[in-house]
Amino acid sequence: MERLEPDYLAARLERGHVFDAACRSREVLVHLTGKWSVLILIALRGGTMRFAELRRKVNGVSERMLAKSLQQLESHGLLVRRSFPVVPPHVEYTLTPLGHEAAARIEKLTDWIEENVHALDPGQADPKPL
């Protein structure tokens, strides 16, 4: 059986056209890579969390932005919201398998950023060309 090269396979797979303004992938990309969404996904890699726990973990996020980001991530199937019928309200958020995969990939990018933050400093004089 003929072995196909990865570049060939990538070209053959329909992945969307992220550069097209009407592409659904772009909408997901915008929601997934938002400042708060990235931090929420990484925080939830540690396990299920309640709203207040997430708010404390993701320092600086407002209640409104946390709720909005959680709704967007849930709408894309990256996390599950579980509500318990108790007073006071008890709501938990857990990553789905797809959410775990996305979070793992995003965490690699954030690790790279933290390792290279000094080189990425806008105040640095001359960045080295490739």
PLM regions and their residue ranges:
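Long, low-complexity, charged/polar intrinsically disordered regions in eukaryotic proteins
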Residues: 1-14
